[in-house]
Amino acid sequence: MIKLTKAEKNGLHGEITVPGDKSISHRALMFGAIAEGKTVIDNFLMSDDVMHTMGVFRALGVEIDHTESQATVIGKGLTNFKAPSAGLDMGNSGTSTRLLMGLLSKQPFDLNIFGDSSLSKRPLRRVADPLSMMNAQFELSNDEFLPAVIKANTELNGITYHMPVASAQVKSAILLAGIQAEGETTIIEDLPSRDHTERMLRQFGGQIKTDNGVITVKKQSKLSGQHVLVPSDISSAAFFMVAGLITPNSEITIKKVGVNPTRDGVIKLLERMGAEITQKPIASDGEPLADITVKAQTLHGIAITAEDIPGAVDELPILALAATQAVGDTIISGAEELRVKETDRISTVISELTKLGADIDEKPDGMVIHGGTLLHTSNGSTLLDSHGDHRIGMMNVIASLITEGDVVLTGEEAMSVSYPGFVEDVSSIKREWL
């Protein structure tokens, strides 16, 4: 339980470097493990979720060393993992679970996988179904959930799969199985989802074709270890972008942020709301990077629809907070995906922000946020809850910066899933400037 206070009248100022991208850190570990030779990962995110991915590969016999911001992986190739002595703990990580269901679907031994109570409520059928079409075999609790068994298997077959809903996790699971499968595996996307897996497969020497939403891979004979520079996580940077925009008299620069065009939906949506966001590109061999500067300014309500969701699904909680401060209404629709995140984020976003006086209507697939609300506590103090969800916890911290009265946050430990040290970093730009 921690006490949070409003920002000073002169606002938030300074430069901040947020931790490495969670999605890319997961994938760098995975590709490093299945490659041959050494992979060095810089600006590696040491968060709870990513450490569970690391723990899985160590249990499978992969040698991994790390310092505070670098990991070194000695790859074993795709066929040299050892059978673990116990079940594989996914913690709270949906990324680990879904991607590894594909990556580990062709091992000569059963793999028992389990997670915490939150992860055990998240559906797995939508990733298990296409993988089963490839001859992968799973035993899921109640045919849907963890704990589960990835069954021993010696053969995968390529498929053509039309994605029913844009999902980078499902797509990546199929691709990671596809590089081990006989024949071609083709995925058809109507809406683009984040493409970190495709980019990283190329970086590690894999063959992949992408053409206007059609992605094709074949069985890969060998991948080679690489040096991977992980950009700062745009999903984490989004909290500081919104903080700078909605806290009066602020100006913040967020350094070396990954601005992959399949992930920068939050920037596009904030710009549609009227934000002027300055990007200063940084030369990079891998993912595109930029320094991002924001200043306090007036925002306007917009409509966020299904086609916007894949590029900004993780940022919708903090966008909802921004919308409470915008002029006019913001309508979020086509966002059913939020209901199967770490929490039902439609419900938890509304639960927490309305405690501070926000005016929000819940819809089955989103919400309507009536803007222009001065956030305030009840009787001088309000208790907010992270609900065990890192992004809800971080949204609450940013909300406190513009809230009259004292805010007390419970469940703050959830933020370490993606951003250990988040509260300290917020404090560093919040201190009173002379």
From Swiss-Prot:
Q: Does the keyword Transferase apply?
A: yes
GO:BP terms for this protein? Answer: amino acid biosynthetic process; aromatic amino acid family biosynthetic process; chorismate biosynthetic process
State any single GO MF term: 3-phosphoshikimate 1-carboxyvinyltransferase activity
Q: Please state what class of enzyme this protein is.
A: transferase
Locate the active site: D314 (proton acceptor)
The UniProt annotation places 3-phosphoshikimate binding at K22, S23, R27, S167, Q169, D314, K341
Record's GO cellular component terms: cytoplasm
* Protein name in the entry: 3-phosphoshikimate 1-carboxyvinyltransferase
Q: Which organism is it from?
A: Leuconostoc mesenteroides subsp. mesenteroides (strain ATCC 8293 / DSM 20343 / BCRC 11652 / CCM 1803 / JCM 6124 / NCDO 523 / NBRC 100496 / NCIMB 8023 / NCTC 12954 / NRRL B-1118 / 37Y)
